[in-house]
A protein has these predicted regions:
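Hydrophobic transmembrane alpha-helices of multi-pass small-molecule transport proteins
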Residues: 49, 73, 121-143, 192-196
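Specific alpha-helical transmembrane segments that line the substrate/conduction pathway
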Residues: 36-47, 87-120, 238-245
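Loop-to-transmembrane-helix transition segments
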Residues: 7-15, 61-85, 153-161, 200, ...
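Loop-to-transmembrane alpha-helix entry segments
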Residues: 66, 99-102, 115-138, 148-155, ...
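Specific transmembrane alpha-helical segments of multi-pass solute transporters/efflux pumps
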Residues: 18, 54-97, 102, 138, ...
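Glycine-/small-residue-enriched transmembrane alpha-helix faces in small-molecule transporters
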Residues: 1-39, 77, 85, 130, ...
Length: 245
């Protein structure tokens, strides 16, 4: 299907709304905490993708999984870290702190690709990295002075998200340089599965109410499974046309 300009704009608005809903939903949870929040969201992501993938790519998708590719497993591990760290961070500190910390993702990606792939960075990128570092340092210093006991640990957990995302992008670039076309949507399924298995024992005994499970089910289906499927499909098309630094 070819998107018209108007439909493409509304699609972007929709997927942005889906991604931004996690902070709001987390603040409306009644009893679910920390690792249990992550477990239920990841669990419903797995269930959703088990339905979405065959509908989207056909039933043969399961026979095409690159189980022998190390990049597939590393990619799944990165998604697992991102899924787990994001929700745990939201339960530890303010949503704004988490999102600001995650905003360093593109700059971390630039640094990692420079170190491991040898990509050259223009002077403006180095300047942006320095300014971002100063800004984040100033933010951390001002927040620590307020005496919030969870701010530092919450921010450190949130920092795992852009780090894992940067490693993820570097893996994609590396796999492409070796002639492998890594499909990231099955990697999302693997990441959600790993996240569920990791957080399940840490979630016991379950405390989430039916209301909480319903909200986290919405996150798993719409914020992760649906949003990521759309975004990664767009990214795959865009990679054929341009390179992103």
């Amino acid at each position: 299907m070819r998107l018209t300009h108007g439909l493409a704009v509304w699609t972007m608005v929709g997927v942005t709304a889906l991604w931004s809903m996690a902070g709001v939903v987390t603040r409306h949870l009644e009893q679910a905490r920390s690792f249990e929040v992550t477990f239920w969201r990841s669990f419903f992501t797995v269930v959703s993708l088990l339905v979405i993938l065959p509908l989207w790519q056909g039933r043969s998708v399961w026979t095409r999984l690159p189980l022998r590719s190390r990049y597939f497993w590393f990619s799944g591990l990165c998604w697992s870290v991102m899924f787990t760290a994001f929700m745990v961070a939201l339960t530890l500190t303010a949503v704004a702190n988490v999102l600001i910390t995650m905003a360093v993702g593109p700059l971390l990606t630039a640094l990692i690709t420079r170190v491991f792939l040898g990509h050259r960075l223009p002077a403006r990128t180095w300047l942006a990295i320095v300014l971002a570092g100063i800004g984040i340092g100033w933010m951390y210093g001002s927040q620590l002075s307020l005496g919030d006991p969870n701010f530092l640990i919450g921010s450190m957990v949130a920092l795992c998200v852009p780090i894992a995302g940067s490693v993820q992008w570097t893996l994609v670039q590396k796999s492409q340089s070796e002639g492998q076309n890594l499909d990231l949507v099955p990697s999302v399924l693997l990441g959600a599965l790993l996240s569920s298995l990791l957080t399940l024992p840490l979630s016991m005994p379950f405390q989430a109410s039916v209301h909480d499970v319903g909200l986290l089910g919405v996150l798993g289906l719409f914020q992760l499974a649906t949003w990521l499927s759309i975004e990664l499909k767009k990214l795959k098309r865009k990679q054929r046309q341009c390179a992103i630094i």
